[in-house]
Amino acid sequence: MSETDMRLVVVGAAGRMGQTLIRIVHETPGVRLHAAIERSGSPFLGRDAGELAGVGQMGVAVSDKPLEAFVEAEGVLDFTAPSATVEFADLAAQARIVHVVGTTGCSADDEARIRAAARHARVIKSGNMSLGVNLLGVLTEKAARALPAQGWDIEILEMHHRHKVDAPSGTALLLGEAAARGRGIKLADHSVRVRDGHTGARVEGAIGFATLRGGSVIGEHSVVIAGEGEMVTLSHSATDRSIFARGAVSAAIWGRSQKPGFYSMLDVLGLD
């Protein structure tokens, strides 16, 4: 541990992603766990964060005081829920630190509050923090641009574990936005998220979504571009949720040297 290590806070520390983030921070050179935050009343308050995450004692007790933690830290890693994330965004702005947001399912109002916080914080937000998925987004945009809507239909399929609460996934929407950029259209005006009963023929230029939930699947995503007599499929499989945590820590380190603003993983990876 060095005095120059970036001091990071993990919020939602007792959750699956929270524990994974703690483990990755513990093993990554150049960063250290400054604080671990849980909601008030959590049975995990006071527990050592390292023991909770299975890496042994780290000397950091789980707390329910985020602002106290933020003002002494340099960054926060946030894979919580939209209602919590907008509150953490406000606190990160007050503390003027890096806020890495992997939370999905945010509403338009939530997004507006997070973007407003970026006037003072360095916000890095993505529906997926992995290198592979962000590269998939770039490839999807290029394919959508090369293959015209007249004759080529885009469908995005995703599957996650039974506990995921939002649909389509943030990654599916990230891929949908990439496809829409490639086509020069707005996703909101062309997405089809529900098909049931007599739907009629497919509308040219639509971007369809199909969602599956079950088991312990970490994340499966495919972009299908179907033409007459041929089909292009671009896909990504996540087999270990640590890929998201590693991406988040890399994003925090990158954000440390940036000016306040709103960034994505494409900025972090130099793919934008």
Swiss-Prot record:
It catalyses: (S)-2,3,4,5-tetrahydrodipicolinate + NAD(+) + H2O = (2S,4S)-4-hydroxy-2,3,4,5-tetrahydrodipicolinate + NADH + H(+); (S)-2,3,4,5-tetrahydrodipicolinate + NADP(+) + H2O = (2S,4S)-4-hydroxy-2,3,4,5-tetrahydrodipicolinate + NADPH + H(+). Its EC number is 1.17.1.8. NAD(+) binds at residues 12-17, 38, 102-104, 126-129. InterPro entries: DapB_C (IPR022663), DapB_N (IPR000846), DapB_N_CS (IPR022664), DHDPR_bac (IPR023940), NAD(P)-bd_dom_sf (IPR036291). This is 4-hydroxy-tetrahydrodipicolinate reductase. Pathway: Amino-acid biosynthesis; L-lysine biosynthesis via DAP pathway; (S)-tetrahydrodipicolinate from L-aspartate: step 4/4. NCBIfam families: dapB. It is an enzyme of class 1 (oxidoreductase). Transmembrane segments: none annotated. One of its GO terms (cellular component) is cytosol. Keywords: Amino-acid biosynthesis, Cytoplasm, Diaminopimelate biosynthesis, Lysine biosynthesis, NAD, NADP, Oxidoreductase. Its main location: cytoplasm. Signal peptide: none annotated. It comes from Sinorhizobium medicae (strain WSM419). Catalyzes the conversion of 4-hydroxy-tetrahydrodipicolinate (HTPA) to tetrahydrodipicolinate. The active site is at 160 (proton donor/acceptor), 164 (proton donor). PANTHER family: 4-HYDROXY-TETRAHYDRODIPICOLINATE REDUCTASE 1, CHLOROPLASTIC-RELATED, DIHYDRODIPICOLINATE REDUCTASE. Belongs to the DapB family. Pfam families: DapB_C (PF05173), DapB_N (PF01113). NADP(+) binds at residue 39.
